[in-house]
């Protein structure tokens, strides 16, 4: 009975997981079917754009070892997803803070979202085989675009841009999940210790 009560704590994280996955895939499929590769649409002037790009690799357009690396990366992602699932079950059993579980649900949703692209998109969209799909990215926030002064000792005269990486909903979910965990680390575990002490 106690175990069932603890696992109820995973209901909201599971809803968050499903919501992020659905939004991630809907946005990706829309971009994939309505934009041509490299197409860019300004949403908020030069600060926020939709820019359709694809990559074989990790979050924010980073790549890893070409096609052979793609298989390794996908296998690693699947192993990570299984580990996170097991960890969340264990954390819920230990009465982890709800926001802590939601944070891991965001990370899990992001990982699964990009795995779906990697495994299925190549075959579904007809450009490659299973496990060789490209991850669809679209959000581009070049918040700062400037030129480094000529009198600087390094990179003088070069263009500087922040934030350069193009990313997707899954990448954002992973990042938000990690940020919440890092910022709330002290609070999450202090709360758990207080609960254990009261028990």
Task: Tell what function each PLM region has.
Residues 1-199:
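Alpha-helical transmembrane bundles and membrane-interface segments of multipass inner-membrane proteins
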């Amino acid at each position: 009975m106690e175990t069932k009560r603890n696992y109820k704590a995973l209901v909201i994280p599971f809803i968050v997981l499903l919501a992020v996955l659905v939004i991630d895939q809907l946005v990706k499929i829309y971009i994939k079917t309505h934009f041509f590769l490299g197409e860019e649409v300004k949403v908020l002037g030069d600060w926020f754009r939709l820019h359709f790009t694809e990559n074989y690799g990790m979050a924010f357009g980073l790549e890893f070892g070409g096609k052979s690396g793609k298989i390794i990366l996908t296998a690693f992602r699947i192993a990570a997803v299984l580990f996170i699932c097991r960890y969340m079950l264990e954390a819920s059993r230990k009465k982890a803070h709800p926001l802590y579980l939601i944070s891991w649900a965001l990370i899990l949703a992001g990982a699964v979202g990009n795995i779906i692209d990697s495994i299925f998109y190549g075959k579904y969209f007809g450009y490659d085989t299973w496990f060789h799909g490209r991850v669809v990215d679209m959000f581009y926030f070049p918040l700062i675009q400037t030129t480094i002064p000529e009198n600087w000792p390094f990179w003088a005269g070069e263009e500087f841009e922040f934030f350069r990486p193009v990313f997707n909903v899954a990448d954002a979910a992973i990042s938000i999940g990690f940020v919440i965990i890092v910022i709330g680390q002290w609070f999450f575990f202090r709360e758990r210790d207080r609960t254990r002490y009261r028990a």
